[in-house]
Amino acid sequence: MTKLNSDVLLANALRVIAMDAVEKAKSGHPGMPMGMADIAEVLWRHNLKHNPLNPEWTNRDRFVLSNGHGSMLLYGLLHLTGYDVSMDEIRNFRQLGSKTPGHPEYGITPGVETTTGPLGQGISNAVGMAISEKLLSQRFNQEGFNVVDHMTFAFTGDGCLMEGISHEACSLAGTLGLGKLVVIYDDNGISIDGPVEGWFTEDIPARFESYGWQTIANVDGHDPEQISAAIIKAKEEDTKPTIICCKTIIGKGSPNKAGTASSHGAAFGEEEVKNIREELLWSHEPFEIPEEIYEAWNFQEKGKELESDWNKLFSEYASNFPDLAQEYSRCMSMDDPNGLEAALLEFANSMQEQKLTVATRKSSEMVINVLGPLMPELVGGSADLTGSNNTNWSGTVAITKDNFKGNYLNYGVREFAMTGIMNGMVLHGGIRPYSGTFLTFLDYARNAVRMAALMEIPTVLVYSHDSIGLGEDGPTHQPVEHLTSLRTTPNIETWRPCDTVETVFAWKAAIQNKTKPTALILSRQNLPTIDRDINQVASINKGGYVIYESSNQPKLVLISTGSELAATLEAAKVVEDSISVRVVSIPCTERFDAQGKEYIESILGKDSIRVAVEASHEDWWRKYVGLRGSVIGMDSFGESAPGNVLADHFGFTKEKIVASLRNYL
């Protein structure tokens, strides 16, 4: 065998790290890291702007491993370039409490920009990051001071491009002309079930060309010169995103398994590991990296220099544009603007006095009109339902390819990509995105919502048309199980306000919450403002509170939310002639549960009979009403009819609630 050149030798270090880590864990995916090692070496050593000593540097290039099963490629890169990922962490790959989980996880491993694993979502995150970069550059950059100026790179595989979200996200990226987005496609022709020619035969360059992307096809993914030339060409194109299609061999270096599905998702085994070491001319022990290879890979000094140069630029920028510099720092730190809370509380009190009867989707629009002037970082959007979701406001300006000084994205009918893109925007920093669709279409976006919760990021999800109350469109559009789906997801707050006042507090929670996503569940139909005193208004922030009672020692406690609360309150005033009643509004069960046992019992009553009323699936409320209690809810899909007819048919009018209560009691 001939002597290896330096690029190949350094790439081989990535290969053996991945191979050894998977072998020790007895599980993992060595094939992709070994196949993409040459590409990763060229990108990370010669083209990626980053600082291992400060993974949070705001002007770093973003790198997303969309094909997250190949996580050991990323962990190897982070270790070799000098991030806080030790060889002991590499040895503990896929073990409890390590910094090297099976798939990359945001917040666990320094240098990991987003959690990936569900294929395709990383691409949507990368699109979101590129959108944020372009929005912030348009807002903050001044002549001679490009303080926001970085690339977003994403690795992707066949699986990502088979997933529908890749089509949704990449189509929009092309329409928006995201010139600083580069996707590198690992075209190895293999997936778990074998050669993809049996199920994935589309012309990827032609597909992306139709989206409006620059396509660089037929790059040898094991030739450093071809890879380098392609990346340079991609960075030179600033009017459209680029996909670089690299022909690679999965499991490259394995004499017996390279190019086969058997290298994808399992350890090679002791004998093949020995064969691979011989094939790669790698004589070192497992987890042993020669010092000269560490020296060649280490990026700490270069990264420190890159950030230092930017810091000098930003210091001059701050001297010339102090207000802009301060605002940039505020947005990147996700600090609330001055006066935000006071403005929202003043608006809530005003709405309590005015007692408007409006749909909570309209209430939400009214709140956005309060937030918008105070939060230039607020970027709205909708999946082609702007007029129905009421996600625009008086200051809405559409973001287009030719105008990135806007504040509103028309996502088109792309619910999944919309949510993944918002996640990427939040992860980038500097932007607070929100967007809307109908609650029933949560299902299209479900996994991206879950990923936001898993990553503990404050994506704001606006879901209108929240029940059978939407009426004639029928059961295809009437959510039943969706609230339960959201509420049973860890680390998300789901608010279903009953009127404008509760909607203000829902938005307040969404904006002030920095560690979890918030879902705002809004009605299509008009709802009256409920009577409250000042203490009740303040108690909304606790997620659940007493809205009405005929006795401070009630025998019957009625629990309700959203559009059913008003009818429940009316029903309580009918039945209170025969039993002492309390009505409790719980707009956010997660916030309510967090108040603790003592508060919960003080609101729900320790020994009271409890009945919950909500036009959603019944099961969620069983934990509140207990075995003695009852739920007036939905246990079937809806029907097509006017909303008021359906409310009567399914038992959510005052009269039907009264009848149900008397029958139960």
Predicted regions and their residues:
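Cofactor-binding active-site loop characterized by glycine-rich and histidine/acidic residues
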Residues: 35-176, 392-393, 425, 532
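Terminal amphipathic helices with adjacent charged low-complexity linkers/tails
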Residues: 58-59, 242-254, 258-339
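Non-catalytic terminal/interface segments that mediate subunit docking, oligomerization
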Residues: 312-458, 536-546, 552-553, 559-562, ...
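N-terminal capping segment at the start of a domain
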Residues: 12-27, 186-188
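A short glycine/serine-rich beta->alpha loop
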Residues: 3-4, 21-30, 58-66, 109-120, ...
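Thiamine diphosphate
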Residues: 95-107, 125, 131, 135-139, ...
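Glycine-rich phosphate/pyrophosphate-binding loops
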Residues: 51-52, 133-143, 427-444, 459, ...
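A short, small-residue-rich loop immediately preceding and capping a beta-strand
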Residues: 25, 61-62, 112-115, 143-163, ...
